[in-house]
Amino acid sequence: MGNRHAKAKSHHGFDVDHDAKKLNKACKGMGTDEAAIIEILSSRTSDERQQIKQKYKATYGKDLEEVFKSDLSGNFEKTALALLDRPSEYDARQLQKAMKGLGTDEAVLIEILCTRTNKEIMAIKEAYQRLFDRSLESDVKADTSGNLKAILVSLLQANRDEGDDVDKDLAGQDAKDLYDAGDGRWGTDELAFNEVLAKRSHKQLRATFQAYQILIDKDIEEAIEAETSGDLQKAYLTLVRCARDQEGYFADRLYKSMKGTGTDEETLIHIIVTRAEVDLQGIKAKFQEKYQKSLSDMVRSDTSGDFQKLLVALLH
């Protein structure tokens, strides 16, 4: 999946007993020591936070999540709880929330399923089954329809080639198939798009997009914009943008969540928490390059209080 600047901050001197004790003290009695909570949550890896959760429960006989729910509030609470989940569990909860009740938040399904690796998709499916005792694929099938359902179900198979080899002949053939399926005829044959966008490696897709450009002197994005609409268009464009430059895609999403009036805190939390140990360093560099300002500075000016402090700490 290209270069992933991992930020696995495994700490020398990680002491699970000390952290559990410190968190207990931070949440005991009158008032909460938010600074202590921020310091621990932001400077431990996801695996270390799992150990802290287990230690806390074994020592104090209660779930750290429940303690946070009663002691914290607002976006600070949301972020702290997100950090107590494994990334796959957090994604699974977001997906369930997007589908439960009336109506479906398709944007969340697209954002998660179109941007995860095979291994991540498998982990999300397993977490969803474990947390909700339901199949993610069945729920997605029941909650979406038509061509959007088809592409999401294809992605849920976690069948993308993740090798490094590029087959030039295949790229040419795929480009021709995409042209025949879209621009080349009335109505779009989504099957060809699903086959290519859900199964080829990012490197292979970049070769296909190049071949497409040469073949008809047009970007694949332009064809998708002309031929599709709504959520299907959003899904295809997300897949294309991630194949072209995944870190750039997330940098754009973060920028859009903050620019103008109002802030989309859900997107901010979701991206910063789930990319923290994947490619957040690369996303930060891309953000600086594209927008001539640091992601931390923009987060600082767009958020406030303990929520701001926790996000900024996660970005360092």
Swiss-Prot record:
It is a lipid-anchor. InterPro entries: Annexin, Annexin_repeat, Annexin_repeat_CS, Annexin_sf, ANX13. Keywords: Annexin, Calcium, Calcium/phospholipid-binding, Cell membrane, Cytoplasmic vesicle, Lipoprotein, Membrane, Myristate, Repeat. A lipid is attached at residue 2 (N-myristoyl glycine). Annexin repeats lie at residues 14-85, 86-157, 169-241, 245-316. Transmembrane segments: none annotated. One of its GO terms (biological process) is positive regulation of Golgi to plasma membrane protein transport. It comes from the Eukaryota. PROSITE patterns: ANNEXIN_1, ANNEXIN_2. One of its GO terms (cellular component) is basolateral plasma membrane. It is found in: Apical cell membrane; Cell membrane; Cytoplasmic vesicle. A pair of annexin repeats may form one binding site for calcium and phospholipid. Belongs to the annexin family. This is Annexin A13. It comes from Canis lupus familiaris (Dog). The gene is ANXA13.
